Amino acid sequence: MDNGMLSRFIMTQTLLVFCISMTLSSHFGFSQMPTSSVQDETNDNITIFTRILDGLLDGYDNRLRPGLGERITQVRTDIYVTSFGPVSDTEMEYTIDVFFRQSWKDERLRFKGPMQRLPLNNLLASKIWTPDTFFHNGKKSIAHNMTTPNKLLRLEDDGTLLYTMRLTISAECPMQLEDFPMDAHACPLKFGSYAYPNSEVVYVWTNGSTKSVVVAEDGSRLNQYHLMGQTVGTENISTSTGEYTIMTAHFHLKRKIGYFVIQTYLPCIMTVILSQVSFWLNRESVPARTVFGVTTVLTMTTLSISARNSLPKVAYATAMDWFIAVCYAFVFSALIEFATVNYFTKRGWAWDGKKALEAAKIKKKERELILNKSTNAFTTGKLTHPPNIPKEQPPAGTANAPTVSIKASEEKTAESKKTYNSISKIDKMSRIVFPILFGTFNLVYWATYLNREPVIKGATSPK
């Protein structure tokens, strides 16, 4: 009885273990089936796309443009600016870092598959036809290759291709500097096909004239300019090889004036004011006024030279040149004014001394006449002399005293005519005229240039 119960218990345990093992094995078997099926499906997709690409490139000639002999190839373009600047005034160029996008349709690359878009490796770009785009006003362009070539290529199932690359471009920016430093410029970026005329390849903007060129919010790298906006357009040029379309994007810049106010304008204004301090010094202070005049002239010369160092050597005068020239004229005029005052001061002293000497001579003659009359009256009178005094000898102090007193009075009169610490009439006028003229000039200058809208040739202003 005990043996039977024991055998039943063992059989029950064995059956239970068998059921559990079967359950576990069946569970793990079903859980692995989807994984293997997904892997098989992935491998199948890779195989399909590999066959698609091999089939697309089989017999493909990248030397021929799409639609050759049938239609004009249309290339749609747009630009995303990641970094704008710096701008060089001396070289008249600017640097820009962009994502340059081009899109076109190539019917030879149509495919049918489980996906509508194929993201492709950049190596495939060398095996298919791509537009021969070049930048007309580019001085130097760099295609980034770190860590791999910064290029993107996508293929739609209808044969539409998107080709994007990252470029750093140094381009020419013609500048008209007549209004410098209150000037504005439109720096162009021009590109188009190098070999294909309009009869074969045409370029159009992808998103119209408003959103085809976009600048990142933190993309400005400008210290002396404000980036006011950008506009796009197209140009057509005719050459001996045909008519070509040029895509143009203008970046509108407005110069910041703060740096030049601190470095040039304020020093010039202070130098002119300093030169006018000499009008308030005595005209006899020749050394002090000479130092004022010469120092301010040399200072203005130094400022004019340093102001030109940050500009290209243009043949015309800028707004800053006119300001410096007028300030230089005021400073130089102050020096000439002092020379004039000094000249007339010395001449006035000489003229006053001459008049004093002539007046002294006239008085001397009058006194001699009076003295002669008194002497004659004294000699003709009936005077009795002591016996011990001869008659020929005049009384003591009557003959030499008038002569000595006349000479002393002449010298005192001549010296008294030289009035020191006096104010020249020219200085009085200069104290009023010079500040008024300089203040009027500043009002006219700043009102003219700050309120005038700069004219930019060859570009429309951004809206």
Swiss-Prot record:
Subcellular localization: Postsynaptic cell membrane; Cell membrane
GO biological process: associative learning; behavioral fear response; cochlea development; gamma-aminobutyric acid signaling pathway; inner ear receptor cell development; innervation; neuron development
Family: Belongs to the ligand-gated ion channel (TC 1.A.9) family. Gamma-aminobutyric acid receptor (TC 1.A.9.5) subfamily. GABRA5 sub-subfamily.
Catalysis: reaction(s): chloride(in) = chloride(out)
Name of this chain's protein: Gamma-aminobutyric acid receptor subunit alpha-5
Assigned keywords, A-Z: Cell membrane, Chloride, Chloride channel, Disulfide bond, Glycoprotein, Ion channel, Ion transport, Isopeptide bond, Ligand-gated ion channel, Membrane, Postsynaptic cell membrane, Receptor, Signal, Synapse, Transmembrane, Transmembrane helix, Transport, Ubl conjugation
PROSITE patterns documented for this protein: NEUROTR_ION_CHANNEL
Record note on quaternary structure: Heteropentamer, formed by a combination of alpha (GABRA1-6), beta (GABRB1-3), gamma (GABRG1-3), delta (GABRD), epsilon (GABRE), rho (GABRR1-3), pi (GABRP) and theta (GABRQ) chains, each subunit exhibiting distinct physiological and pharmacological properties.
Organism the protein comes from: Mus musculus (Mouse)
Disordered as annotated region, ranges: 387-408
GO molecular function: GABA receptor binding; GABA-A receptor activity; GABA-gated chloride ion channel activity; ligand-gated monoatomic ion channel activity involved in regulation of presynaptic membrane potential; transmitter-gated monoatomic ion channel activity involved in regulation of postsynaptic membrane potential
Side Cytoplasmic, residues: 341-428
Cited Pfam families: Neur_chan_LBD (PF02931), Neur_chan_memb (PF02932)
Ranges in the topological domain labelled Extracellular: 26-260
Record note on domains: GABAARs subunits share a common topological structure: a peptide sequence made up of a long extracellular N-terminal, four transmembrane domains, intracellular or cytoplasmic domain located between the third and the fourth transmembrane domains.
Residues in the signal sequence: 1-25
Function, in words: Alpha subunit of the heteropentameric ligand-gated chloride channel gated by gamma-aminobutyric acid (GABA), a major inhibitory neurotransmitter in the brain. GABA-gated chloride channels, also named GABA(A) receptors (GABAAR), consist of five subunits arranged around a central pore and contain GABA active binding site(s) located at the alpha and beta subunit interface(s). When activated by GABA, GABAARs selectively allow the flow of chloride anions across the cell membrane down their electrochemical gradient.
Entry's transmembrane regions: 261-281, 287-308, 319-340, 429-449
Cysteine disulfide partners in this protein: 173-187
Cross-link Glycyl lysine isopeptide (Lys-Gly) (interchain with G-Cter in ubiquitin): residue positions: 355
GO terms for cellular component: cell body; chloride channel complex; cytosol; dendrite; GABA-A receptor complex; GABA-ergic synapse; neuronal cell body membrane; nucleoplasm
